[in-house]
């Protein structure tokens, strides 16, 4: 009827709004949240990726399989832990090697320095004039060519080792020297001096022997 009247009188037909029913529910009158639940989820889109030689798509969640030279499957986590353990053993061996080259005093000083650095992590940064520990450290510190050092109290000598014993020394035979100093425990036995000590000792013995001869000659006369 509307189309007939439009053709006859030239008026446009009224557009009727069509309503869709989704499972007996009016779309225009349904709440928005209810409309979203009624809509079907979109189909998953095919994603591009790597494919095998046979054309089969590779699942991106599959883990890469690693093999060694003989073809056995290896675990990456196990290999990382083994490499870390080897690195730690190497660092420990190098640290022991460096400690063996040092004397007992140097090792003790390094240990005390490390303990002091660890203790400083929990100490306060600010230092006041009445700080007892800092004042004792400053007072016990030896100062070169201090003219007033002899008037103060005697500073306690640091122990040579942690147990208070003597330092290790060379147990074999060694060339004599004028100060009678024994070589260290790490000495390889090679005399690398220029021969001055031997000449000096020989000259001292010769002078002493000549003095004895002169004394005997004086007594004979």
UniProtKB/Swiss-Prot annotation:
Involved in pre-mRNA splicing. Residues 76-124 form a coiled coil. The keyword Coiled coil applies. This is Pre-mRNA-splicing factor CWC26. Keywords: Coiled coil, Cytoplasm, mRNA processing, mRNA splicing, Nucleus, Spliceosome. It comes from Yarrowia lipolytica (strain CLIB 122 / E 150) (Yeast). InterPro entries: Bud13, CWC26_splicing_factor. Residues 1-54, 113-174 are annotated as: Disordered. GO terms for cellular component: cytoplasm; U2-type spliceosomal complex.
């Amino acid at each position: 009827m509307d189309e007939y009247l439009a053709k006859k009188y030239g008026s446009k037909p009224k557009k009727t709004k069509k309503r869709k029913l989704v499972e007996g529910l009016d779309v225009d009158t349904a709440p928005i949240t209810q409309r979203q639940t009624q809509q079907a989820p979109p189909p998953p889109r095919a994603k591009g990726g790597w494919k095998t030689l046979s054309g089969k798509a590779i699942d991106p969640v599959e883990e890469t399989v690693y093999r060694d030279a003989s073809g056995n499957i290896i675990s990456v986590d196990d290999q990382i832990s083994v490499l870390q353990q080897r690195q730690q053993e190497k660092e420990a061996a190098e640290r022991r090697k460096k400690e063996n080259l040092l004397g007992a005093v140097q090792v003790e000083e390094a240990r005390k320095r490390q303990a002091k650095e660890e203790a400083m992590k929990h100490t306060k940064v600010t230092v006041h004039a009445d700080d007892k520990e800092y004042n004792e450290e400053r007072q016990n510190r030896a100062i070169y060519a201090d003219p007033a050092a002899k008037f103060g109290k005697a500073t306690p000598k640091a122990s040579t080792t942690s147990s208070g014993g003597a330092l290790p020394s060379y147990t074999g035979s060694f060339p004599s020297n004028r100060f009678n100093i024994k070589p260290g425990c790490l000495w390889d036995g090679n005399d690398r001096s220029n021969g001055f000590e031997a000449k000096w000792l020989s000259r001292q013995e010769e002078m002493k022997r000549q003095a004895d001869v002169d004394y005997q000659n004086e007594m004979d006369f």
